[in-house]
Structures are given as structure tokens and as C-alpha cells.
């Protein structure tokens, strides 16, 4: 995979692609011009009419020219990017839930999980993507053990995205430039297809080099440079009309000096004495780590669909993903950095997944059934190790090499089966489903005896969880343009490895691992309607209006034990009355998150537009630091209200699309502090409201087949803003993005 993203290979494929241009023209009788669709969710796609689903297609993705995957989908209602703008500093928040275990992320069907302390959780290169699907909430039995907020499915490009009819070999070149951080992006592809058109291969590489971002006041977000290389190999083999095999492989690397906490913004400057002692360069680097990150993803899919057998539609998938971050501080760095992964650290998260399912279609009297049955096996592994040079002579710290007490190593195994019957009768679709999960958590003993002391409650033994989840859905097509829907699910999740096996030293107030945790459970309900009107004002136009209300009731929330440690201190006076051994995590009583979304989309041959509005509010039954208290508190991770709007026009004759997009965000001042003044550790700073305006243009010159020019201007008015979920990290200033691409 490194070959793909080497610059010399980029130049080689460039030369090959130029030669292929002549061949491609000879092999194709159709124009290679792009048909520019409106930069909105396509209302004509039936998959977009599913409740709670938002879709970004390839044109949407390419026009945004986003630097990271989280920022790409930030435009969707109910979806927000959390964190800052440094590389690898972004997480996702869907309808007020933002923990990594709440938002399920998949790349080509492979689960991606990364929960490193103070880091982002998503490292997918947008240049690779052809489609992003966001399913909000957990209403499908195909997904279990978490993912309460929803599932984000990223799909990589395919050979068919580049090939014309009857084309056997093709190429692609792209150059991009961003003004804010002087970013240069280079992408190239080589595409092959056999004579029978049943085998195609895509080789795709992308290089992204950027300097520091600038804030609206023109100051730099120091150490936000990006040096990233990514490669993709994707093979489709239609073995026969009934058998399809797909293999995809993604590999990305990122290296550079950056703050340990990638999600944060402001970096304290080195003192004058440090500069005098070490020099400016080393004085700054003493506050940084040199990060070597590798992200890889492999998926093998097999589909069997007999032509005349409605009982069989078999799908099998085997996937493996791994993310590795190795951080090293300079030798001049101080010691005693246990709380920030020491002087050097080696962190790896991996996911191994196997899924097999079959869908049978049959009739019972006047009803049509689609019966889905599947089996799943998943393995999540977390390997962590750090080196703290201040502990090099201490045997109880294994002479400096041990696992961070707040990031234990361990494995989680999931065995599951699921069943769903979707019943269609006249204009009503009723679905019911069940899922059973059996979870095995297995901790790994810490190498440091300081965190491996059974008398302090450091117990890394296996813990098992199991249970059923239930799903109901109803969709009623009132007529050809109005659909009403409602969904309900009752699901649960087991603790992740960090929650189960985090420790502290014996003398601390909460030293123990958390083997007494119960399952966290949630009941989710949503209701709404979809109106779809075609040929409303003119031929071939479309209008869609969607409204959704959701209500989530969570119980036994898994949360850190801080503040009031036991029921004996419910009055919050003195924790000395509590037992000596307290677990690091506990179950809080519960919470309610509810909200609404309104969406309107219009598109026609010449005009398109959209308006969306999302509102979420959430409260815990008690304070996060006192589960025995009587005062409810706001949930800190609830995003402020957000509205987006877009308006643009197409000029089909000239293959031109021009548009404007705006985002309006309300202030957020609801804080746990209003219910518990001592809950500052679980609060985010209040934020002011703001509005951002963007412009975009896409043009495919008619005389140069396959060429496309895109221009996007982000933050047109250079407005200063601080996103609430970024903990008031500054937004970036005006950014003019330009790209030029050529298909051969």
C-alpha cells in the first residue's frame, strides 16, 4: 500500500494516465462530462426516504473539499463535529451523544473503534469516499452492543466511478489547494476492467500536505500541520450473475509534531527560561509529541443472489481494521508525565468482524415478508504501553514500562444472532426484530505492580454480559406523496475495556477496577413523516419535506466515579465515610435526550435548495458526580440548535453549478453547573451563537472531456467562532479551496 502513495508512483501513474487518455477516448462512445447534481441530499433516491437517514453522495463529498471526515458530515442535521481542527482531533456527535462507543463508525463495512485519551476517533481520508450514510439512532437488529447515537457508514470509491461504458482502462488525476493553511492535495488512480466486464480493479492514492491553520484573526493554530498519505485497492469480481466478491484495502499514515491532546486548541507557550536553556525549537517540542500514526482497513465481501430463488440472498463479510499511534517526546522533555502517556507510548486498537446473513422473500396470504437472519462474531483488542522515564528505577512501576492506568489493555468478544421480519400489507410496512448478544470482557494485568494489586481492587478477570434487544417499526404510505413512520427499540451495551478495567493507585479514593458494572440500557422512540412531491413547479423537479421527533430514555448510564463516592455521603459532606475500595466507574440512574429535526429539499434542472433545523435537549436524573442527589442536570454534550440552508443553480448547457450554503448555530449555555455547581469537570464552556457562509462552484469544460474544476469558499466573511463541542477551540478563518481533476 505504501507504493500507492509514494510521490514517484504518483508521477508514474500521471504519465501512464496521459497515455491512457487516447485509449479511453477510442473505447468510449459516450461523453466523459460530469452530470452535475445539486449539492444536496438527492430526494429521488429511495434510500434517502428511510426515517432518520441522511446521505452524502460523491458529488456532495467532492464539492465540500473537506480536510477530514468529521467536518465533511458536519453539515447534516443532528450531526456535529466535536474537537478541534488539528489532524486526528475530531470526534462525532449525533443528537447529543458523542462518546466513541455511542457512534458506530464503519469503513466499507469494517468497524472502526478508537478511544485514545484526548484524541479524535476518526481518521478516514475524504478523498477516498464515494458515499456516506448516517443512520441516526439504533433501530436495526444488525447492530448491537452500543451505537446508541447511530451508525456512520463510509464507502470508498469504486472502479465504476471512473470508467465509461465499454472502457477497459482508465486513469484519474487531481490537484487541490487550500488558501488558509497552504494545503496541497494530490490524488491519482489507475482503473482496470477485463473484456467480460466482470472484474474491475481500482488503485487509488492521495497525498495531503498542509501548514498550520489560521484563525479568523490571522493567528496560527500552532502545530496543526498535516502530512498524510493514503492508498486504496479495491477489486470487484462478478464470478457469475449470482456470485459477487469484493475486496477493499485502505492504508493511511500520518506523522508530525503535535500536542498530545489533539482535540484541544490553545497550547501554552514555553517560558523564557526554557527558551534560553533549550532554544526556541526544543522549548516548543518539549510540549509536543512526535506522532507516528497508521490506519489500516481490510474487507472481504461475498454475495450470493440466485436469479429464481427468493429464499436466498446471502451476504458474508470478513473485515479487519487497526489504528496505531506511537508517540515520542524529545529527550529534553520533562519526566513525571504519567497522566499524558509518559515520554513514549505505543497504542493499538483493532477490530476483527465476521458477519453472515440471509434475506428470504415470501408471501403469506396477502402479505409480503422479507425475513432477515444473521450471525455475527466480533473481537475488539486494545494494546497499550507507555514509558515514563521518571519511573525507570522503580520496580513497582516495572522500571518505567507499563500500561496507562486510565487506558488498560484488554479484549472484548461479541457473539450475536439477529432476526428481523419486514411485513408489507397494502400500503403498510411493519417490521419486528430481535437480537441476542453475548459479550466477554477480558482485561490484561498491568505490568506495573502499582496498578496490579488485588488488595486495592485491581481485578482484571473476565466479565460476561448477555441479553436481548427488541425492535419495532411501522411505515404507512397515506398516499403517493405522504408517508408516516414510527420506530421503537430497546437495546443495551456492555462496558468497554476502559470502563471495566481502569484503575488508580491503592491510596487514591477510587482505586479499583469496575467488575460490578451493570449493562447500560436505552429505549428509543421516533415518529415523523415524509412528504415527497415530484413535478411540483416544472417537469422533473422534486421537493421533499421530512420531520422527525425522537425520545431516548437511558438507564444505568456507565460513568466515572468522581465526586460523591457512596450513598453514605449522599449529602456530599465527606467521602471518608465511604469504603476504602471504590470502583472507577459506576451506573448512574438515567437520562432523557429528546429533540426534533425539520428538513426541506428542492431540486430541479436549474435550481436547488435546502433548509434544515435540528434541536436537541438532554438531562440526567441526577448530577453526574452524585447519583444519590435529587437535582437533575443538563447533559454537557448536547449541541446547540443548528439550522442550515443552501441555494444554488445549475447551467446544464455549460456543466456549471454555483451555490451558497450557510450554517446558523445558537448559543449554548445549558450546563451541569446550573444543577450542581461542583460539576465543573463534566461541563463545557458556554458558547456564543454564530453564522457561517460558504460559496461553491463546479464546472466541467465541454471541450475538455473528463475535466472538472471546483471552488469552495468556507467562512466567506472570515467570522470568528468557537464551536461549543470543540470546548471553545477556535474555528478557522476564510479558506478558499480549489481543485482541478481529470479523468482519462
From Swiss-Prot:
Keywords: Cell outer membrane, Membrane, Receptor, Signal, TonB box, Transmembrane, Transmembrane beta strand, Transport. GO terms for cellular component: cell outer membrane. SUPFAM superfamilies: Porins (SSF56935). It comes from the Bacteria. It is found in: Cell outer membrane. The keyword Membrane applies. It is a multi-pass membrane protein. Residues 1-24 form the signal peptide. The keyword Glycoprotein does not apply. Residues 168-744 form the TBDR beta-barrel domain. Its main location: membrane. GO terms for molecular function: heme transmembrane transporter activity; siderophore uptake transmembrane transporter activity. Residues 45-157 form the TBDR plug domain. Heme receptor. Belongs to the TonB-dependent receptor family. This is TonB-dependent heme receptor A. The gene is tdhA.
